[in-house]
Amino acid sequence: MSSLKKILGLKGKGKKSKKLGIAPPPYEEDTSMEYAPSAPIDKSYFGVDEMDTHDPNQLRYEKSFFTVKMTVRSNRPFRTYSDVAAAVSHWDHMYIGMAGKRPFYKILAFLGSSNLKATPAVLADQGQPEYHAHCEGRAYLPHRMGKTPPMLNVPEHFRRPFNIGLYKGTIELTMTIYDDESLEAAPMIWDHFNSSKFSDFREKALMFGLIVEEEASGAWVLDSVRHSKWASLASSF
């Protein structure tokens, strides 16, 4: 049994989640690959039903409670929001977490980055620049990603390094998002952004792997999400 555990990379002494009874994913471990479907799923396979296929033109609305806490430490002060976005967009490099929540986490990371505020220099650790953001609330997201799986109230933590041009440092993110089944109205997720930080919303969203389109009404809709190597794209801004 011990040999089998070694092969599978299991550890018997890992702490278990009190709520789910399973060991939490190793969010900070390095891995040589990300998990993603390599081909379309055949409808005849087990568990595949109509929720796995969708009309890309069908508009859906996802209403949720969310919380995002972000800390960014850098070796030097950021000059523009483009510098911030280039760094923070690395948060899900080599992502290991709940796959169904990743598109929503991308939005929360984008949201948090627009609300970052610098810590007074006298309070910064060893004099290095620090930035913090804490956003929470209720919101709905218009999207064309098809039917999404149920989302539970389980926080996830991510810590990643970044090295973009002149900037080096770390990003720490704690995010929670779960279904809001109430009948109360909620604002769009985009209303929680600090839009004064930038004007080119579509371009900045793309740095986080978010493909958004503007409707005739002026509202933004999430069309799709990309999980490719956004580091090279982000570093070009």
UniProtKB/Swiss-Prot annotation:
Compartment(s) of residence: Virion; Host endomembrane system; Host nucleus membrane; Host nucleus
Region (Disordered): 1-23
Protein keywords: Apoptosis, Eukaryotic host gene expression shutoff by virus, Host cytoplasm, Host gene expression shutoff by virus, Host membrane, Host mRNA suppression by virus, Host nucleus, Host-virus interaction, Inhibition of host mRNA nuclear export by virus, Membrane, Phosphoprotein, Viral budding, Viral budding via the host ESCRT complexes, Viral matrix protein, Viral release from host cell, Virion
Residue window of motif PPXY motif: 24-27
Main localization (coarse): virion
Biotechnology: applications noted: VSV is used as an oncolytic agent for cancer therapy, because of his wide host range, rapid replication and mild pathogenicity in humans. VSV used are mutated at M51R in their matrix protein. These mutated viruses cannot successfully infect normal cells, being unable to counteract the antiviral state induced by interferon-alpha in normal cells. Cancer cells are impeded with responsiveness to interferon, and then can be successfully infected and lysed by the virus.
Purpose of the protein: Forms a double layer around the helical nucleocapsid, the inner matrix layer binding to the N helix and the outer matrix layer binding to the envelope glycoprotein. Plays a major role in assembly and budding of virion, by recruiting cellular partners of the ESCRT complexes that play a key role in releasing the budding particle from the host membrane. Condensates the ribonucleocapsid core during virus assembly.
Listed name of the protein: Matrix protein
Organism, as annotated: Vesicular stomatitis Indiana virus (strain Glasgow)
